[in-house]
Amino acid sequence: MHRHPAFPFEGKRRGISDLLYIEPYNLPSNGRHGEQKWDWPIEQPLKMPKEERAGLLTHPAWLAAYSLNEDNDPIHRGIWVYERLLAGVLGDVPPDVDAAVPIDPHKTLRERMEPLRAAQCWKCHRKINPLGEPFEMFDDWGRYREVSYFDEDGKIYMRRDGQFDRLLKEGKLTTRKIDATGEIAFSGDPKVDGDVKDAVEMMQRLGRSDRARQSFIRHLFRYFMGRNEMLSDSKTLIEAEKSYLDN
């Protein structure tokens, strides 16, 4: 059995764009003319390891949606958490600021984001980066990981296909432990605020936050109603929160 599907563009890294097209298994170019054997779990619903997943924001669908084509996107993941779960408000990026993260194939994404801790950047990024960086325990496909891989030239290796398996077996890839630590600093609850070791701990902590719960319900209301809430909607919001707690 082939563990990995064939991809039409071998020169590309595996990103969200590759989810849009995977070469069909029955094409002659795939060399799969015999009976296919699948190793998907037969028990449904599948129970994910509790040390790897904790709710919707650790689901591969959300993680892939908030990824770049070829890498994670901790900044926009952090913005999502800050605005929708902590009811935070961010200003626009100043027009004279270069918002691009430096490119360096010899460094992990988190290492490349270190310049954002400079004083002129950190006054805003301190609100979002510590909330987005815990998701580094997953790759841009939402797969759980504990290490980053580097090739013999010291460049980060993003592919996860048959070639990856071969290089790993031959000992041609080195590893560097993932740093998924972060911090909750604006929940309004001292019991929730503080350092977190990864996204699972962060989600469990936010799950106990009154502010996160009420902010989530408020944004859910806006999504379904297509407008902001008004004073006259207070009863609806109170009932929505009661239903949330009861379930």
Give the role of each language-model region.
Residues 225-229:
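Axial heme c-ligation environment in periplasmic c-type cytochrome domains
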